[in-house]
């Protein structure tokens, strides 16, 4: 190797340093984006150490989704102000992406926790549980709405949760009023709800009261049978049903094969006779 290139990196050395394939360096040279500092007549190429920083900037922009054509314009006509503007712009995009990933992680962790709890649950059991007050995001009233408006109300609820970035991975639940339960109207929820994180104003919240609830389970959409068993349990213990029942899936079709294999949890308010 001649004296003038001993302090330079060969293409192979520079590609290893930058953790890319040699073909990437060849391609960048072909499109005029990034070229070796020295090109010999015999075809050998050499890169200087200070080119590493330039390549890092190219890699950074590429990782941020900037097209190579745009990167070329930035690199060739770069000024401190222009690069600073792009870096600040991309920094904002990264912050947004980080927040999105954090929310996704929260959603996934909730799904993991709920599924683990479901796998440890005896779905044939019925019990009384004292529950603390809990706040949910509530749909508009859906009782007796025409089918398309019923569906629209659910869509509105989901849209609001997404709009305010309140989703934590909890399932959509449904509320039956006492009158519906007594009349065995189990196919027409009064409201839908979702448990969400705090932080949004001017949205419709519902507070599930603290108190005693009968907790049972619905298997494969067999709603009427599930409520019959729970009500019998309540009455055998000298109690009566309260104002509302809250239903939400523990194992839905995301984790089981077929609707007939789904499991829903029912929380039915109870009170003394």
Curated annotation (Swiss-Prot):
Source organism, top-level taxon: Bacteria
SUPFAM superfamilies recorded: Probable bacterial effector-binding domain, Putative DNA-binding domain
Pfam families: GyrI-like, MerR_1
Molecular function terms from GO: DNA binding; DNA-binding transcription factor activity
Annotated region of DNA binding: 11-30
InterPro entries reported in the protein's UniProt record: DNA-bd_dom_put_sf, GyrI-like, MerR-type_HTH_dom, MerR_fam, Reg_factor_effector_dom_sf
Record-annotated HTH merR-type domain positions: 8-77
Disulphide-bridged cysteine pairs: none
UniProt record, GO biological process: regulation of DNA-templated transcription
DNA-binding among keywords: yes
Keywords linked to the UniProt accession: Activator, DNA-binding, Transcription, Transcription regulation
Record function comment: Activates transcription of the blt gene in response to structurally dissimilar drugs.
Designated name of the protein: Multidrug-efflux transporter 2 regulator
